[in-house]
């Protein structure tokens, strides 16, 4: 597993997907240019099984905490400093199907030095059994994603959040249970009743 990795950074990719020839170069270039970087994610697209057709490009925004709490927009390609990995631990099988989302959330809890490379540096192979082509094939992954977000909230001290799946698979909504305490307003106006 991850404990066997000896490099300074670890890149996460699925075994059947494709990296363009410049993907790792661009990641190293970003790390050299911005030495405080602790995690990197890139833009991505989907690719046909024969590798001839590229489609559904996903041009991502720079790091956005609220968006990350709503969907795993990091997804592919994700590169993270080994020290961050050692701090947060590896992939948690409790979130099978969304263990990458849980991992990204845990990484984002220990570093804000997250960098977006605005280039398509990952080609997600779309086949009928993958969530790339058939999201309904792995509904358990979306349920695990909701649990991963709820666990993230608990770790950062937000106990009043309820996470639900939206109509769009892989997109979640957080409902915060807000108390309605009694509010008192004190207006210091002794001897100035006309001002009221």
Features from the language model and the residues they span:
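Short aromatic/hydrophobic "clamp" motif used to bind/position activated sugar donors
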Residues: 10
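Donor nucleotide-sugar recognition loop
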Residues: 89-105, 140
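Catalytic donor-sugar/metal-binding loop of nucleotide-sugar-dependent glycosyltransferases
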Residues: 93-95, 105-125, 129, 147-166
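N-proximal low-complexity "stem/linker" segments adjacent to membrane-targeting elements
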Residues: 150-195
């Amino acid at each position: 597993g991850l404990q066997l990795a000896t490099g300074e950074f670890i890149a996460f990719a699925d075994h059947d997907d494709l990296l363009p020839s410049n993907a790792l170069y661009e990641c190293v270039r970003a790390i050299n240019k911005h030495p405080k970087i602790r995690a990197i994610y890139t833009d991505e697209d989907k690719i046909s099984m024969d590798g001839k057709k590229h489609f559904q490009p996903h041009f991502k925004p720079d790091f956005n905490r609220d968006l990350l709490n709503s969907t795993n927009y990091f997804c592919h390609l994700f590169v993270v400093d080994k020290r961050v990995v050692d701090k947060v631990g590896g992939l948690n099988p409790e979130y099978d199907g969304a263990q990458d989302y849980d991992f990204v959330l845990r990484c984002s809890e220990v570093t804000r030095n997250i960098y977006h490379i605005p280039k398509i540096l990952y080609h997600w192979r779309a086949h009928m059994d993958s969530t790339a082509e058939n999201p309904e094939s792995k509904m358990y992954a979306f349920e695990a994603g909701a649990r991963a977000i709820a666990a993230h909230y608990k770790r950062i001290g937000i106990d009043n959040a309820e996470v639900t799946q939206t109509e769009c698979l892989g997109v979640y909504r957080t409902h915060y249970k807000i108390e309605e305490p009694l509010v008192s307003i004190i207006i210091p106006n002794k001897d100035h009743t006309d001002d009221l």
